[in-house]
Amino acid sequence: IMPSKACTISGSTSLINFAYINEDSYLTRLQMLAPLTFKNITLQVWQIAANGHALTFDEGVTVVSKYTSGGNDIAGIRNIWGGTDSSSDVASSDITIKSGQFGWICGGSGSTGAVIGTAKITMSGGTVNGSIFGGGYEGACGNTEVVMSGGTTCWIYGGGEKGNVTGTSKLTISNTAAITENIFGGSDSGTCGNTEVNVSGGTFAYGIYGGCFTGQVTGFSKVIVTGGNFSGTIYGGGFGKKCGQGDSRDANLGKVGKTEVHVSGLTNGEVSVFGGGLYADVTGNTQVTINTGKYNHIYGSGYVESPYNPAHIGGDVTVTFNDGET
């Protein structure tokens, strides 16, 4: 049983080992009862449900326990939920990561329980081998906020996995953050009210999407990019689903209400900018503003690969080119 008062579990060096096991000596899920900080310690932990309590991985945390993914054994805490792993709701959640290794992190809950207020994740170090979700695996959140200034992750979402965000999901990326896959302001398959993505630094391999993967943004998606080591593509909208000839296209996948994209300071000439989505529609207006920099292509519309993937825009398309070149 974990402490019922705020606690720091630390060692004089990271060689000190903390293992959370059940009566049969198997690694088991840690249920938090109060705010908890790990520092200068080696961990053997399977999963953590923070239950709405502040969870911090301070400097000097190393995780040696392993989980299986894709047939491989990977060192890290497999799952962390800022909310609950049940149908119980919490007022808010707060996860801070400065070191350590992890599989999947959700600011929200692992089951149907909601985070009524804001679910927040702050990452300045450490490694996430899977994905970061500001929201829940299933449960809804009022708002979400993900701030990443360092460390490494594969995918990162401002919103949830299946879980909805009824208000606004915010994603801020800066400094030395490294993302090896795509960036989404919204959810994977859940919905969001609005999304905001602000990128001022970091290193990126693929795309920045203001919207969701296949989930919907019912209001607006706003993307502001002012820096970063990046050679991919910026989309104001969502990803959607690629269709081939004869496929039935679901126009709701990745759909966004309206978009704004503001870009400046990217100078390598390799980045393309779209006001809309990749394979996803925008029902209202799109607006792209270029302030400075050098770019590959700039479109106020969505990406149009073929007649089977039109990425429709339902409203007006506006491109404002204040300065820069293509």
Regions found by a protein language model. Name each.
Residues 1-11, 299-300, 326:
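Short intrinsically disordered, low-complexity coil segments enriched in acidic
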Residues 20-22, 43, 51, 169, ...:
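Generic detector of ordered, mature protein regions
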Residues 2-8, 16-60, 72-73, 82, ...:
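Extracellular beta-strand-rich solenoid/capping regions of secreted or surface-exposed proteins
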